[in-house]
C-alpha cells in the first residue's frame, strides 16, 4: 500500500448544515424520482457519484439549477428586448434605410494611391495587323493606333494561325462556348481528356491534369501532397502563385538563396542531419520548389544541379514552368529538353500554363499516373473550379500538334530572344541606369534599375523594402503603401508612357501586388518578343525603348 504523506488529511470535514440540508433534499428528491419511469437509474448514478465524490454532486446539482433558471428566463428577456425596440412606421424605416451609408469595402486612401495604375492599364481594342494593336487607356480618354506590341506573353503566336482558328470555330459549333461545371461534375468532356493525353505524350510523362486557371494550379497541387510536419525548401525569388502554394501547404518552409546551389546543399544537409537527430515517428514528405524561367527576373534554374541534389538528399522536385514551356528546348518542351534531360526522372511535379506560349488559357500539371490520380480527388481547384471551355482545349491540342510536326516557331523565338537580350545587355549607355536580369533564352526581358541608381534617386534598397514589407505584415496592415517603392513604379511607368507616346511601342511594368508578396522583390520593366516578329521590327522597337529609358533617366538627373 502506498504511503500517504502526513501533510494530507485523512478526511475532508463537511459542515453540519450542508449535511442536514443535503439529506432532506436527497430524501424528497428520491421520493420524486422513484415515481418517474427510469428514475431508479438516476438514483443509482447519484448514489455512486456521491459516494465517490460528495462535492461533485453539489456541483452537478448547481449546474442543473442554473440551466433551469437560464432557460426559464429567456422568454422574459426576449419580451424586455422587444419592449425596448422603437415602434417605427414603414415610412420611417424606409427613410432610415435611404439615409444609411455603408462603409466602403476598400480603404479610400488606398484607392486614391492606386488609381494611377488603373488609368495606365492598356485595353486592346483590335489587332488589324499581327503584333500591331489599337489600345485605349483611362476609360477611353487615351487612344493609340498601330502600336507595336512588346507586352504579349503569346510567345509562339501559333494560336493566331488559320489551322488553329478553324479548329476553334468547329469546336464552338459542336460544343458551345462554356463548360457545365467542375471536372468531376460533368465539366470534363472528351476533348479535355484528349488534351490531357496529348500533354502527357508531348512532354514525356505518364499523365497530366488540366486546371481552369493557371494561377490556381500551383496553390492547389502542392497543398494536395503536403501536410503539417512536411518540409519544403524553396528558392527565395519564386512568384506569387508559388508563394501562395507554400502558404497553403501547412509545411515547414525554408528558403535558399536565389539559384545558389551551395546555399541549397548546405540547407539540405542541415535538414537531413536534423531529421536524423529528431527520430521522427514518420518520414516527412520533402520538396524542393523552384521555377524554370523565373517570373520576376527572367533567369534560368540550373536543372542538372537541382536533380543531383534532390536525388542525393531524397527530396522531390517541384518546378513551375509557366514561362519556360514552349520557349526552351529544340521543340519547346521546356527546361528538361533545354538541358537534354528526361522530364519523367528529373522533375517530379511540373506546373505549366496554357496562357503563355500555347496561346490559350488555363493551366496543367505533369507527372506520374499516381500523382495525377491523387489530384483528381485531393486538389481544390480541380475538384471545385469550373472546367475550361472546349474550344480553349482543342486549340491547345492543335498547337501541340503543330509544335510536334514543325519547330520553326520555337527556333525563331529563341533567336529573337537572344537578339533582344544582346541588344540591351551590350549597350554601355544603359549600364549606369538599368541592369538585365534575364537569361538570353528567356522570351521576357526584365530590366531593373541598378542598385546604385535606385538608392541615389529613391533612397532605398531591395533589403530595406523587404524589411519594411515584413514590418507592415507583422502589424497585419493590408494596405502596404511604401512611398519610395511607389515613386519607382511611377518612374518606370513614365518610361512605358514615353515609348508609347513617342514611338508607338508598348512595353509594360512587371505587375506586382505588393500587399500579397512575402519575398524580396523590386519593380522592373518587361519586354516580350514572339515568333511572329521580324528581326528588323524587334531591333527598331528595342532602339525606341532604349531611347525612352535614356530620356527619362537623364531627365531625372537634371
Swiss-Prot record:
A molecular function (GO) term: serine C-palmitoyltransferase activity
Predominant cellular place of this UniProt entry's protein: cytoplasm
Subcellular location(s) per record: Cytoplasm; Endoplasmic reticulum membrane
Phosphothreonine, modified sites: 121
Recorded catalytic activity of this chain's protein: L-serine + hexadecanoyl-CoA + H(+) = 3-oxosphinganine + CO2 + CoA
A single Gene Ontology CC term: endoplasmic reticulum
Membrane topology of the entry: Multi-pass membrane protein
Domain notes: The first transmembrane domain is not required for stability, membrane association, interaction with LCB2, or enzymatic activity. The second and third transmembrane domains are required for stability and interaction with LCB2.
Subunit comment: LCB1 and LCB2 encode essential subunits of the enzyme and form a heterodimer. Component of the SPOTS complex, at least composed of LCB1/2 (LCB1 and/or LCB2), ORM1/2 (ORM1 and/or ORM2), SAC1 and TSC3. Interacts with LCB2 and TSC3.
Protein name: Serine palmitoyltransferase 1
Species for this entry: Saccharomyces cerevisiae (strain ATCC 204508 / S288c) (Baker's yeast)
Gene: LCB1
Amino acid at each position: 500500500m502506498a504511503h500517504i504523506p502526513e501533510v494530507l488529511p485523512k478526511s475532508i470535514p463537511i459542515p453540519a448544515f450542508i449535511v442536514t440540508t443535503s439529506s432532506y433534499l436527497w430524501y424528497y428528491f428520491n421520493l420524486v424520482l422513484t415515481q418517474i419511469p427510469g428514475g431508479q437509474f438516476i438514483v443509482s448514478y447519484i448514489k455512486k457519484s456521491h459516494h465517490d465524490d460528495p462535492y461533485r454532486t453539489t456541483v452537478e446539482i448547481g449546474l442543473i439549477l442554473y440551466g433551469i433558471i437560464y432557460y426559464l428566463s429567456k422568454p422574459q428577456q426576449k419580451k424586455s428586448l422587444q419592449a425596448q425596440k422603437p415602434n417605427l412606421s414603414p415610412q420611417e424605416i424606409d427613410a432610415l434605410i435611404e439615409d444609411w451609408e455603408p462603409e466602403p469595402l476598400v480603404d479610400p486612401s488606398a484607392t486614391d494611391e492606386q488609381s494611377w495604375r488603373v488609368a495606365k492599364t492598356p485595353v486592346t481594342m483590335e489587332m488589324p495587323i499581327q503584333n500591331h494593336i489599337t489600345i485605349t487607356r483611362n476609360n477611353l480618354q487615351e487612344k493609340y493606333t498601330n502600336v507595336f506590341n512588346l507586352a504579349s506573353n503569346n510567345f509562339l503566336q501559333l494560336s493566331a494561325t488559320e489551322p488553329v482558328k478553324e479548329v476553334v470555330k468547329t469546336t464552338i459549333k459542336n460544343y458551345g462556348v462554356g463548360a457545365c461545371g467542375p471536372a468531376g461534375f460533368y465539366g470534363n468532356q472528351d476533348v479535355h481528356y484528349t488534351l490531357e493525353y496529348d500533354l502527357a505524350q508531348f512532354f514525356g510523362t505518364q499523365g497530366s491534369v488540366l486546371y481552369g486557371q493557371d494561377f490556381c494550379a500551383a496553390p492547389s497541387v502542392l497543398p494536395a501532397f503536403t501536410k503539417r510536419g512536411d518540409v519544403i525548401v524553396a528558392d527565395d525569388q519564386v512568384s506569387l502563385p508559388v508563394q501562395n502554394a507554400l502558404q497553403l501547404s501547412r509545411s515547414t518552409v525554408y528558403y535558399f538563396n536565389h539559384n545558389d546551389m551551395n546555399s541549397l546543399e548546405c540547407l539540405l544537409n542541415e535538414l537531413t542531419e536534423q531529421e536524423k537527430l529528431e527520430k521522427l515517428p514518420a518520414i516527412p514528405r520533402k520538396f524542393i520548389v523552384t521555377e524554370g524561367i523565373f517570373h520576376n527576373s527572367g533567369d534560368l534554374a540550373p536543372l542538372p544541379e537541382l536533380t543531383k541534389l534532390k536525388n542525393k538528399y531524397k527530396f522531390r522536385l517541384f518546378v513551375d514552368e509557366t514561362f519556360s514551356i514552349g520557349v526552351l528546348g529544340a521543340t519547346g518542351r521546356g527546361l528538361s529538353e533545354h538541358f537534354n534531360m528526361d522530364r519523367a526522372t528529373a522533375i517530379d511535379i511540373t506546373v505549366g500554363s496554357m496562357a503563355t506560349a500555347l496561346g490559350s488559357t488555363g493551366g496543367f500539371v505533369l507527372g506520374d499516373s499516381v500523382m495525377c490520380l491523387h489530384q483528381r480527388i485531393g486538389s481544390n481547384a480541380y475538384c471545385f473550379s469550373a472546367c475550361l471551355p472546349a474550344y480553349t482545349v482543342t486549340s491547345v491540342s492543335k498547337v501541340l500538334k503543330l509544335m510536334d510536326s514543325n519547330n520553326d516557331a520555337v527556333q525563331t523565338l529563341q533567336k529573337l530572344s537572344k537578339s533582344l537580350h544582346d541588344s540591351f545587355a551590350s549597350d554601355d549607355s544603359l549600364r549606369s541606369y538599368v541592369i538585365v536580369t534575364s537569361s538570353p533564352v528567356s522570351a521576357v526581358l526584365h530590366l531593373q534599375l541598378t542598385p546604385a541608381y535606385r538608392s541615389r534617386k529613391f533612397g532605398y534598397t531591395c533589403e530595406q523594402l523587404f524589411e519594411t514589407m515584413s514590418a507592415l505584415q507583422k502589424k497585419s496592415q493590408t494596405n502596404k503603401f511604401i512611398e519610395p517603392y511607389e515613386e519607382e513604379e511611377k518612374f518606370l511607368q513614365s518610361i512605358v508612357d514615353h515609348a508609347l507616346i513617342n514611338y508607338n511601342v508598348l512595353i509594360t511594368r512587371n505587375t506586382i501586388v505588393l500587399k500579397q508578396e512575402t519575398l524580396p522583390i523590386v519593380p522592373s520593366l518587361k519586354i516580350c518578343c514572339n515568333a511572329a516578329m521580324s528581326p528588323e521590327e524587334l531591333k527598331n522597337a528595342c532602339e525606341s525603348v532604349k531611347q525612352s529609358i535614356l530620356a527619362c533617366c537623364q531627365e531625372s538627373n537634371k
